[in-house]
Regions:
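The substrate-binding groove and active-site-proximal loops of carbohydrate-active enzymes
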Residues: 20-30, 48-57, 100-112, 131-132, ...
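Acidic-and-aromatic substrate-binding clefts and catalytic sites of carbohydrate-active enzymes
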Residues: 26-32, 52-64, 86, 135-143, ...
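C-terminal domain-boundary segment and adjacent tail
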Residues: 208-298
Length: 298
């Protein structure tokens, strides 16, 4: 009997063009007006995006109204995405002259906990349901972070990027660097009471690591990832994108309306291919379909 395969869409739902954002400047959330087109495309294929939302987006009434409508129709899920630098409570970290934005794992444990509680409560208050799925800002996880997520009732995380080393992505404090996932695999694991469902990334000799993440130039590579993942033992395929990448000028990758049209051309191709062999599910729904994973939370 052929094993059932599931397609999980994860969207880091955050402010506009954070790649080029500078501290002290206004942080826009205009991309909230550009999410409906993507959701409609997902609906067309009966796919269910998980909008992993951060502080500024959950405080944006446009996003909340949009997501609530989709939640009521069971067309999406809302999980948590945490950017430590603008999520209360605020705590002054040491910094170097040339520093990056802070990772949550740079903060003392009690501050980490309070920031997680802040985001969890905000999402619950805005949507009427406590979030149970999560992705870390800047992909930064450690055992303490997993433990704190478990404390707050989270059941699944999707921050691990197999075969990818983020140590060149510096943090705020002197000498702090991002996580090294280069030795991680695509296998699901259980960490401090939380199920880790890694992003789908394929390691190849010729092209290095390949993601299911559109960048305008990688349609062929994405189709290859879809094909190889289907041939593998993995029962899920995980796509990722940022909400701001759905808006012209919302990212360095899709700067123009033409770039957005190319994005949707590629999305149509890969979604059609994926729909042949995969059933769309949200991240929480995927967990609920696997009783074994649920048992690990007890």
């Amino acid at each position: 009997m052929e094993k059932k395969k599931y397609f999980i869409i994860t969207i880091d739902t955050e402010g506009d063009n954070l790649w080029e954002w500078k501290e002290g400047t206004a942080l826009g959330t205009e991309n909230a007006d550009f999410l409906k087109r993507f959701q409609n495309l997902c609906n067309q294929y009966q796919f269910k995006p998980t909008w992993l939302a951060n502080w500024e987006m959950v405080n944006d009434d446009r996003f909340v109204a949009f997501a609530k409508n989709c939640l009521e129709k069971k067309q999406c899920e809302v999980g948590m995405h945490l950017h430590a630098w603008n999520t209360p409570p605020f705590y002054e970290l040491p910094r170097e002259e040339r520093s990056g934005l802070s990772y949550l794992i740079e903060y003392p444990e009690d501050v980490m906990r309070e920031k997680i509680i802040t985001m969890t409560n905000l999402i619950e208050n805005r949507f009427g349901k406590k979030p149970v799925t999560h992705r870390a800002g800047r992909w930064g996880m450690n055992d303490t972070y997993f433990k704190l997520l478990h404390e707050q009732g989270y059941i699944a995380d999707c921050s691990v990027t197999p075969y990818v080393d983020w140590r060149t992505s510096i943090g705020q404090t002197p000498g702090f660097a991002g996580p090294d996932y280069s030795k991680e695999t695509s296998e699901i694991s259980f960490r401090q009471g939380v199920t880790e469902i890694p992003v789908t990334i394929l390691r190849t000799e010729k092209n290095g690591v390949l993601w299911l993440r559109p960048n305008r130039r990688n349609l062929k590579e994405m189709l290859y990832v879809i094909e190889k993942n289907y041939e593998s033992e993995h029962d899920y395929l995980m796509f990722m994108l940022h909400s701001s990448e759905l808006m012209p000028g919302g990212s360095p990758t899709f700067k123009t309306e033409g770039g957005i049209e190319r994005l949707y051309e590629h999305l149509e191709v890969i979604f059609k291919e994926i729909s042949r062999n995969y059933t769309g599910v949200g991240l929480e729904e995927y967990m609920m379909l696997h009783e074994y994973f649920a048992d690990q939370q007890k």
